[in-house]
Amino acid sequence: MHKRTFDLLLLVPTAPVFFPLLGGLALLVWAVDGRPVFFSQPRAKKHGATFSILKLRTMTCDDDVEARVPTRLGRWLRHHGLDELPQLLQVWQGHMSLVGPRPLKPDDVERLAQAHPAFRERLQVAPGLTGLAQITQVTGAQRTAEVDAHYARRHSRSMDMRILLRTVWVVLTGFGAR
């Protein structure tokens, strides 16, 4: 079974829960923090192609990037990983997978790959909504590069299921979140 098929087999039956939840959270962001509701930014995907990642907006919209601060809902959304929920649409579209290395900005991939060559291996698989580096709580670019490279070389459906189950646990309990 291909990874894309695996993603869709998990996404389709959960869509009646996740998509109304996404709609409700979008309405909540709009009601509490105003517009825009979503934030998008270019990210690198498989083989270095780019796409625009979509998140619920969690920061103020100040023109000065340095002056931006979390919105009233932003801290809570981020803590529970709910700002990432719009990326389920990008899994649906095939830009992302449920599990894989988290997508980085293209210039960050290039900069980090020069310092840590293992970072290039992450581009051999689709970026994910969650990943091995996230559930193992690694810190530092070198260690993240190693964990992402390990995932790119050895990923399997059983590994993806373990990562997804651990992610659900973190989202529901807040335990183990970084």
Segments predicted by a language model, with ranges:
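A hydrophobic, helix-centered structural microdomain
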Residues: 1-60, 162-178
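C-terminal terminal-structure detector
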Residues: 8, 121-178
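Short, glycine-rich, amphipathic interfacial segments at transmembrane boundaries or analogous
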Residues: 36-76, 129-147
